[in-house]
């Protein structure tokens, strides 16, 4: 049986909720949204369909995703434009589209369906493939370099911090031992090294034993959390007053950054005991979601990748007194 095209296999997560949250901000004459993680263009396609006067600027660091999404969205003509960059360069993307402020920014974080499904990219532990994991194939650092050239101490730190794996010391030691004879070149070789380090009793408790190691390596290779820490404040600063920022994350490290940045903007900055809250002390953001919203049971059944999604959204309330900062 012939496999469906990649764009047809991708099902956007929490799509209806994203559109409903964006809708109040798009009630303007010529609204513009930045899709900061374009991927296969699923969310953008739905936005352009639902809001006929909307323009969307899609951002992605993955040239393959930009090419596929561009073909899929070609029929929308000048209502869609794409830019090859990382999503911390949101202001530059807006400027390239000819706007200073936008009405909404959407983040669908983490690894994309395209990257997981394309075996040769090396993101998935379930396929044997070259150790790569680069979201941008033109980037220099790959998982091969990290696995084979980083010291045991550095590997341990990455797997513990980015993978939140308590067996990080054992896994790092096993990787260094395995590469002593010859470099680890494939995902299967890496999986074997991880399996040898994780106790048998623990291998069946939290899914695949290599899941957290692969997450850690992917984050390291693509500097995902560093980029995200810059991107959320940049997004808040790029939306107009009344504009909205929506972020979907897929693991606790991403969600923690989003939560903290949104909470910081939603707090008063008035000094404790200050008798009057001055305008410059008032919150910049209003949180629109109660905690992190999750996909319902039906969506999770239809789209298993939605199971780990956590959605948070904010609205910008006022201008900031210090340019370039929403805090």
Swiss-Prot record:
Family: Belongs to the methyltransferase superfamily. RsmH family.
Principal EC category: transferase
Catalytic activity annotation: cytidine(1402) in 16S rRNA + S-adenosyl-L-methionine = N(4)-methylcytidine(1402) in 16S rRNA + S-adenosyl-L-homocysteine + H(+)
Role played: Specifically methylates the N4 position of cytidine in position 1402 (C1402) of 16S rRNA.
Subcellular location: Cytoplasm
Single GO BP term: rRNA base methylation
Molecular function terms, GO-annotated: rRNA (cytosine-N4-)-methyltransferase activity
Protein name (Swiss-Prot/TrEMBL): Ribosomal RNA small subunit methyltransferase H
Keyword rRNA processing on entry: yes
Keyword match rRNA processing: yes
Keywords: Cytoplasm, Methyltransferase, rRNA processing, S-adenosyl-L-methionine, Transferase
Chief localisation class: cytoplasm
């Amino acid at each position: 049986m012939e496999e469906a095209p990649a764009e047809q296999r991708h099902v956007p997560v929490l799509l209806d909720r994203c559109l409903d949250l964006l809708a109040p901000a798009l009630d303007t004459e010529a609204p513009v949204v930045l899709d900061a993680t374009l991927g296969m263009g699923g969310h953008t396609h739905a936005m352009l369909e639902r809001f006929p006067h909307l323009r969307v600027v899609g951002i992605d660091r993955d040239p393959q995703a930009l090419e596929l999404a561009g073909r899929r969205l070609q029929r929308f003509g000048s209502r869609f434009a794409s830019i090859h960059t990382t999503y911390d360069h949101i202001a530059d993307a807006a400027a390239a589209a000819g706007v200073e402020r936008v009405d909404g920014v959407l983040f669908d974080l983490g690894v994309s369906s395209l990257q997981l499904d394309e075996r040769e990219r090396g993101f998935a532990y379930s396929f044997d493939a070259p150790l790569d994991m680069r979201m941008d194939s033109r980037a220099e650092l790959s998982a091969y370099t990290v696995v084979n050239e980083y010291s045991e101490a550095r590997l341990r730190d990455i797997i513990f911090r980015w993978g939140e794996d308590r067996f990080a010391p054992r896994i790092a030691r096993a990787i260094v031992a395995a590469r002593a004879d010859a470099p680890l070149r494939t995902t299967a070789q890496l999986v074997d090294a991880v399996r040898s380090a994780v106790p048998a009793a623990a291998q069946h408790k939290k899914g695949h034993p290599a899941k957290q190691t692969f997450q850690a390596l992917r984050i390291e290779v693509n500097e995902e959390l560093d980029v995200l820490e810059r991107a959320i404040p940049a997004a808040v600063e790029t939306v107009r007053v009344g504009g909205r920022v929506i972020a979907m994350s897929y693991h606790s490290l991403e969600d923690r950054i989003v939560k903290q940045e949104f909470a910081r903007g939603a707090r008063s900055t008035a000094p404790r005991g200050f008798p009057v809250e001055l305008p410059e002390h008032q919150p910049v953001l209003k949180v629109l979601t109660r905690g992190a919203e999750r996909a319902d049971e039906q969506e999770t059944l239809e789209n298993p990748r939605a199971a780990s999604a956590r959605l948070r959204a904010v609205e910008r309330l006022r201008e900031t007194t210090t340019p370039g900062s929403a805090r």
